[in-house]
């Protein structure tokens, strides 16, 4: 509850660390809030620079400071940010994973048939 309330009141979420995925950045975008993120790791796959947030290139306080100074809270489309975050929902992840496994299984079966092992 408190986290949701804080995200709804925030102008942006600052994600200065290197992470593989970064669930809090996704949660922030689900609340329609842009992300100010270090341009490395999972942020490069979840944040769209200029659309759902902005990147800073170096993991230094100066680079983060410049990003915050250049951030304009009125330049963001909350609905568009929320829509982007939906791509990372549990349901969509399950659908993509299921399709991936099914496709690989079909490829495996096709290889067995082709090699007359099935």
PLM segments and residue spans:
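Short alpha-helical segment that forms part of, or immediately flanks, the ligand-binding pocket
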Residues: 4, 26-30, 44-45, 51
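Acidic donor-binding loop of glycosyltransferase active sites
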Residues: 8-20, 33
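Conserved active-site histidine-acidic residue motif and adjacent donor-binding/catalytic loop
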Residues: 1-6, 59
């Amino acid at each position: 509850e408190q986290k949701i309330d804080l995200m709804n009141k925030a102008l942006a979420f600052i994600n200065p660390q290197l992470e593989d995925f970064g669930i809090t950045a996704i949660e922030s975008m689900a609340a329609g809030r842009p992300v100010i993120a270090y341009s490395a790791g999972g942020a490069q796959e979840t944040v769209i620079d200029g659309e759902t947030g902005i990147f800073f290139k170096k993991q230094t306080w100066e680079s983060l400071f410049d990003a915050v100074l250049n951030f304009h809270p009125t330049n963001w489309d909350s609905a568009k940010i929320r829509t982007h975050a939906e791509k990372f929902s549990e349901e969509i992840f399950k659908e993509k994973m299921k399709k991936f496994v099914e496709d690989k299984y079909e490829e495996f079966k096709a290889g067995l048939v082709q090699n007359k092992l099935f």
